[in-house]
Amino acid sequence: AVRTEKPQAVAEAPAGTTCDRLVSLSDLYATLADYFGVALADDCAEDSVSNLPLWRNPSADAVREDAVQQSIDGSLTIRSGKWKLAMCPGSGGWSYPKPGVDDTSLLPAFQLFDMEKDVRETHNVIEAYPDVARELRDRLTKYVLDGRSTPGTPQANTGAPVWKTVKWLEEQAL
């Protein structure tokens, strides 16, 4: 059991206020720990960042530079600013083209989307912005190899590297 003093209000921003900063569902862990004053061990919630400053002041500085997501088939994406790099052909998830259901053999192995102009992710702009794609891939590679996307001691990924969805780690080019 954790005993804490009565915490202050979670959100101090006026009702109806919006925040355009990048956050991730994984941030809930660190945010709640921060709210309740619980220190997290270095090997706990390695991809979680507290959003509490944003709950209290939506115009505060961003709490994270980028976010990693994993789709239902295990494919990884990285989101940074207006960019999203998907390390898979197709959707990697529930929408068309679905992995294992729809033919993705003729699709590019990787996709880059400008989320400010294309929130539906329909226009792959990887050929127009190869430097952006390489930068995002390099960051994602570091996160996977470090076992975390936050500062701290690198963490081991458990088990043998059998994820087919990270085979791009061994490939050189995008």
Region annotations inferred by a language model:
Residues 1-2, 23:
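Short glycine- and hydrophobic/aromatic-rich loop-to-beta-strand nucleating segment
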Residues 5-8, 172:
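Compositionally biased, intrinsically disordered low-complexity regions
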Residues 7, 13-17, 21, 26-29, ...:
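C-terminal cap/loop subdomain of S1 sulfatases and analogous C-terminal strand-loop tails that border
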Residues 28, 80, 91, 100-111, ...:
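Long, internal low-complexity/basic segments
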